[in-house]
Amino acid sequence: LVLVYRPEALKRHLAKRAVAKLLIKAGYDPGAGVDACLHRLRHRMEGREFPHEVGLFLGYPPEDVAGFCRYCGQKYKYCGHWKVYGDVDQAKALFEQYDRCRDALCRRVGMGLSIVQIFPVV
């Protein structure tokens, strides 16, 4: 998994009450900062069980991540890029946003740009 993110935006996202609550439940300490959470995620990715909380780092709505864990991937309302347990319209809007981002990235890669050129390190 390669995660491209804006540090301040990810910090704000992980600090949201619903997100932080799920992270704590999964053994994270959101108060320790983004780097500590990413280190924990990396450790969990190397483990035997898939860390479904990765969806929180990818911007999935927390109610969808919680629902997936609670219902073991069943009883969802809608399935797109992920299984939706919360607001279907909100999720569909996010799916469209993700599609636009993916398409823009693919166009740039198709033009011969490298990942470093597309996402310059600041």
Feature-to-residue mapping (PLM):
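Poly-acidic low-complexity segments
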Residues: 6-7, 67, 87
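Generic secondary-structure signature for well-ordered alpha-helical cores
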Residues: 46, 70, 74, 103-110
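Long, compositionally biased
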Residues: 81-122
